[in-house]
Amino acid sequence: MEKSKKKKKEENKEEDTIRTYEYMKWNKFQKVHGPEYGLYHFQVPTPQQRKESFDCSGETTLFSKSISHEYTKFYKPMKAPGPNDWLMNHKEYGQTFREYSRFGFHEITRKKKVIYIAPLSFNINPAFDQSFLTAMIILAQDYYYDMIVKLLNINIDLSGVEYRNYEDGSYQLNANTIIEKLFNEMPDDGYCLVCLTDIDLYNNVRVIKPRKWIYYPPPYKNDFCYELNSFKYWVSICSICRFDPLYVVNNPPDDDDMHIKMYFSLLKRSAKLVLKNIGHMFGLKNCIFFKCLMNGFGSMEEFDGRPMEICPCCLRKIFTNISRKFNRLDDNGRVENDKLIYDRFKKIKESLDKNFAGIFEVESKWYQERIESLYLELFIGNKNEELNYDK
C-alpha cells in the first residue's frame, strides 16, 4: 500500500515537472511568473522589433512609406501591462508580417469573398435594431475596403447549446457550442462569418497549468468571454452584452440625452469589437507591438483604451491579403497602388463625419491628421527620401 502511494506520488511529481517545463517555455516577449505577479511578465518589444514587425526596410515604394512614415507619431508602442491586463495573464507570441505571410494567411478567393455579419438573439431597443446593424455593415465596408459586407439572418436552435443559470435569473451560453452551429450557417460565398449577440458568453476550455499555481473554482457569473474565434471554420462570435450600460444599471434613464449617450457608447464599443473580429478572420493574431485595435483585452476598461485603427504591422497584413485578390501586387509581391492607404483613410474619415457625427470625434480627428501627413509626404514631399526608423 505504501509502495503504491509512493509510486503514485512520484508519477504526479513527474507529471507536474513535464507540465511546468512545457508551460514555462520562453518566447521573445513573455516569461512565466507566479500568481503574485500575474501569470506572465510581458517584455515590451524594442524599437527594432517594432520596425521589423511590418518589414518595410529597404522598400522605396510610396505604399511602404505610407505605412511606416511617422509611425512613432501616430502609432503608440505597446507599454508594460498592469497586473490585471491581458498580456500579463495570457500567453501571446505576436505575429510579424513575415510570419503572417508564411503561416497565417487566410486567402480570399473568387468563390469566397463576402464578409457576413449575423445578429443572434438581438434584443436591443427595437428603434435602433436596423440602424445598429446598418452601422456595423457601413463601418466594416469602409474599414476592409473592396470586400463585400452583407447582413446574414440566421436561425440557430439554442436548445442544444450548453448554458449556465444563475440565481438572479440571468444565464450564459457556451461560446464553443455556438461556434460549431455557426459553421453550418456559412453561405457558400462566405469568406468569414462574424456573429454579434447580446447574450452573455463563457468559454469552457481550460488550459493545463501547474497545480500549485491554479485551482478550478465552480462556475461564477464573472467567468465570461467577449469573443471566440475559430481559425478552422473562419467563424467568430462576439458578445456585446457587457458593453451595454444597462447591464450594470438595470433601470433605463428617463433623460433622452443620457439614453442617446448610452446608445452611442454601445455602438462605438460594438463597432470596435466587430472590426477586431473580422481582422482575426483575415488570419491576424492579437497584436503585441503597438497600441492597436487587434490588441487582446480582458476588461471593458482595457478595451476602451484601445484605438479604433490598426497598427502598421496589421495594416500591411490586411492590405497585402486584399491586394492579392484584386491583382494589386507587383512581381515581388508588393502592393502596386501607392494611394491605397491614403484613399482608405480618406474614405473612413468621410464616412465617420457623414454617418456617425458626434460618435467618433476622436477617431475622426486622428484620421484627419493622418491624411494631412500622408498628403504632404506622398504628393508634395520627396518620394525618394530615405525612411528614418530611429526616431
Where is each model-derived feature located?
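Metzincin-family zinc-dependent endopeptidase catalytic domain
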Residues: K111, Q130-F290
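Metalloprotease/metallohydrolase-associated module, dominated by Zn2+-dependent proteases
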Residues: Y233-K261, S265-R269, K285-K391
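Surface-exposed, flexible loop/turn segments at secondary-structure boundaries
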Residues: N123, Y202, F319
